[in-house]
Amino acid sequence: MAYTITSQCISCKLCSSVCPTGAIKVAEDGQHWIDQALCTNCVDSVHTVPQCKAGCPTCDGCVKVPSDYWEGWFANYNRVIAKLTKKQDYWERWFNCYSQKFSEQIQKHQGEILGV
């Protein structure tokens, strides 16, 4: 199964530097793409995983090209649904951290006042 570079690519060129076969190319418009004729998916090499995927700093910058349309459709669907249904606890974590630090500061300040 081949790999492709998606719109999530940030053009950091890390994939092209780690590709052992030089299959990562840059188009005239600056977009990166993988030459399928050169890409070996790092099979039969010292690498256990495709290096373009392993070296990519983005989550979905380099992905497998599904062999079947519906396989790709459902993979994308499941990925999007997982993101949408995942509990967004950023603000809850922020508030807990903030309130803990604030409580520590109040206790420290009260200790200084009572200690004087």
From Swiss-Prot:
Keywords noted in UniProt: 4Fe-4S, Electron transport, Iron, Iron-sulfur, Metal-binding, Nitrogen fixation, Transport
Binding site for iron-sulfur cluster: 9, 12, 15, 19
GO process annotations (BP): nitrogen fixation
One example GO MF annotation: metal ion binding
InterPro entries: 4Fe4S_Fe-S-bd (IPR017896), 4Fe4S_Fe_S_CS (IPR017900)
Alphabetical list of SUPFAM superfamilies matching this protein: 4Fe-4S ferredoxins
Gene3D superfamilies: 3.30.70.20
Domain 4Fe-4S ferredoxin-type: 2-29
Full protein name: Ferredoxin-like protein in nif region
Organism expressing this protein natively: Trichormus variabilis (strain ATCC 29413 / PCC 7937) (Anabaena variabilis)
Gene transcribed to yield this protein: fdxN
